[in-house]
Amino acid sequence: MSSGGLLLLLGLLTLWAELIPVSGQDHPKKPGLCPPRPQKPPCVRECKNDWSCPGEQKCCRYGCIFECRDPIFVK
């Protein structure tokens, strides 16, 4: 391929790359900004199982956090 053909191909690819994001915008952006990312506590493993918790508490998992919590009872 000649250098002129290569430059033409490169130019067309650049133009195509610029047009894709514009055509993908079906709706305008909503007003306002996103709030800061909520801060999550670090992964803490307070317990390994129900028996490692005091009294009637259970070892409850919330994502990567394991903590002793009072149980709830559902009828």
From Swiss-Prot:
Broad class of the protein's primary localization: secreted
Organs and tissues of expression: Expressed by the venom gland.
Protein keywords: Antibiotic, Antimicrobial, Disulfide bond, Secreted, Signal
Subcellular location: Secreted
GO molecular function: serine-type endopeptidase inhibitor activity
WAP domain ranges (all copies): 27-72
SUPFAM superfamilies xrefs: Elafin-like
Entry's Gene Ontology cellular component terms: extracellular region; extracellular space
GO biological process: antibacterial humoral response; innate immune response; venom-mediated disruption of cell wall in another organism
Leader sequence segment: 1-24
SS bonds (residue pairs): C34-C60, C43-C64, C47-C59, C53-C68
Listed InterPro entries: Elafin-like_sf, WAP_dom, WAP_four-disulfide_core
Function: Damages membranes of susceptible bacteria. Has no hemolytic activity. Not toxic to mice. Does not inhibit the proteinases elastase and cathepsin G.
Similarity comment: family membership: Belongs to the venom waprin family.
UniProt protein name: Stewaprin-a
